[in-house]
């Protein structure tokens, strides 16, 4: 599918006011413009910023060439409780503020007239986070288009290294419609390997790459996988590397790697929660220069730009799902939505991460004292098994503080629904 940035032409205002809309360019952190006061309900966790609710609108007249296209609008991150409306009709929602999600505009767009896209983001429900969250549409928005009858499915290309001697990769392609799929592995502009076959919906092609340059933390060599199907084309950057784990720890290309990592949150300092590719790359570069070879996305799925930077610079990534499950850590956090949404959230996280060689590990949660309870132990199994069903090429862990669990087991838990209300 073809991607077009949709970051300009937006208007913004507070949801609970009749103030005039002002133009903004995405990514946009609405919370940074709020007053800072000692009376802020978020307190030190929010940087003393007050919380409000917001609305964004974008008016557009679609090009006539889009009539025969599938139209999918991707929001990489909206904090939080996002609702998306097209011409007054709700077309998407996502409570979690850190996972990318899609609004299907196909057959809903009105041609030859102006359309209005409206996005609501809420952040007045303070406190809802244990760190500075930012607010609004703080990550990029992309419009994905393709022929309705025949195209590569969204997130429909998955690349897996089978072996490194010889260097062999499997490319699985999901399509809408039947036809011939061709796959090329490119080293720069040069074709390194190719294969083709007919498909009726899903096919896996195996390619051997001669004289392959492997990906690791010291030599982050990257290739491009070009998939063609009908008039559609998909380009995926990937690295050839194997990953295994066991008694010897993490093995990358059969060699043990000592993981020297740091936890990083999603904000970019004085830029707030806005996600800029240059800012993400700067963070990774500084960490590499200071001896780190791994980062943990604390405590939520990271941006696509951060993954790209880690791929290019040779930084390992542990992508983490969430800070809590069913026990509140703040009064208005994600707990009420977790049970309904965790599977979709995780599926979107894996779709985002799968082709990135930097991702070596998933985490289902951070300091989850639920694991001290029978219910929580069962949930741990469900989360882990579900992630393995989505991606069996990477291990799954969970941030567990044994001392916190001990305190919880004797009735003195650090986290509890009651404490979250104080």
Which residues does each predicted region cover?
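N-terminal carbohydrate-binding accessory modules
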Residues: 1, 154-161, 214, 226-287, ...
């Amino acid at each position: 599918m073809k991607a077009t940035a949709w970051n300009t032409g937006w208007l913004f205002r507070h949801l609970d006011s009749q103030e005039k809309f002002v133009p903004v360019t995405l990514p946009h952190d609405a919370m940074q413009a709020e007053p800072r006061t000692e009376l802020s309900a978020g307190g030190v966790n929010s940087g003393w910023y007050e919380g409000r609710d917001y609305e964004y609108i974008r008016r557009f007249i679609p090009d006539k060439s889009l009539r025969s296209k599938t139209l999918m609008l991707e929001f990489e991150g909206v904090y939080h409780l996002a609702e998306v409306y097209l011409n007054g009709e709700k077309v998407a929602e996502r409570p979690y503020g850190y996972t990318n999600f899609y609004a299907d505009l196909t057959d809903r767009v009105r041609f030859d007239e102006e359309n209005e896209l409206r996005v609501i983001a809420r952040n007045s429900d303070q406190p809802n986070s244990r760190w500075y969250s930012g607010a609004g549409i703080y990550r990029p928005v992309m419009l994905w288009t393709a022929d309705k009858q025949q195209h590569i499915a969204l997130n429909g290309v998955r690349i897996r290294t089978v072996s490194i001697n010889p260097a062999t990769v499997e490319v699985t392609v999901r399509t809408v419609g039947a036809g011939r799929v061709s796959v090329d592995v490119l080293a720069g502009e040069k074709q390194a390997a190719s294969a083709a076959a007919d498909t009726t919906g899903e096919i896996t092609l195996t390619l051997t790459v001669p004289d392959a340059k492997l990906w690791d933390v010291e030599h982050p060599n990257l290739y491009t996988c070009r998939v063609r199907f009908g008039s559609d084309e998909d380009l995926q950057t990937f690295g050839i590397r194997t990953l295994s784990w066991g008694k010897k720890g993490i093995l990358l290309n059969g060699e043990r790697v000592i993981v020297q990592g740091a936890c990083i949150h999603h904000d970019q300092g004085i830029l707030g929660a806005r996600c800029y590719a240059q800012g993400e790359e700067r963070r990774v570069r500084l960490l590499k220069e200071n001896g780190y070879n791994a980062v943990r996305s604390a405590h939520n799925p990271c941006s696509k730009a951060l993954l790209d930077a880690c791929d290019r610079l040779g930084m390992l990534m542990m992508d983490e799902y969430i800070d809590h499950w069913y026990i509140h850590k703040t009064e208005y956090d994600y707990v009420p939505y977790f049970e309904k949404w965790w599977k979709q959230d995780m599926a979107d996280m894996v779709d985002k991460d799968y082709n990135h060689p930097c991702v070596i590990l998933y985490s289902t949660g951070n300091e989850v004292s639920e694991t001290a309870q029978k219910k929580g132990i069962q949930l741990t199994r469900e989360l882990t098994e579900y992630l393995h069903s989505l991606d069996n090429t990477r291990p799954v862990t969970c941030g567990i503080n044994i001392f916190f669990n001990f305190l919880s087991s004797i009735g003195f838990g650090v986290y509890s629904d009651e404490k979250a209300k104080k």
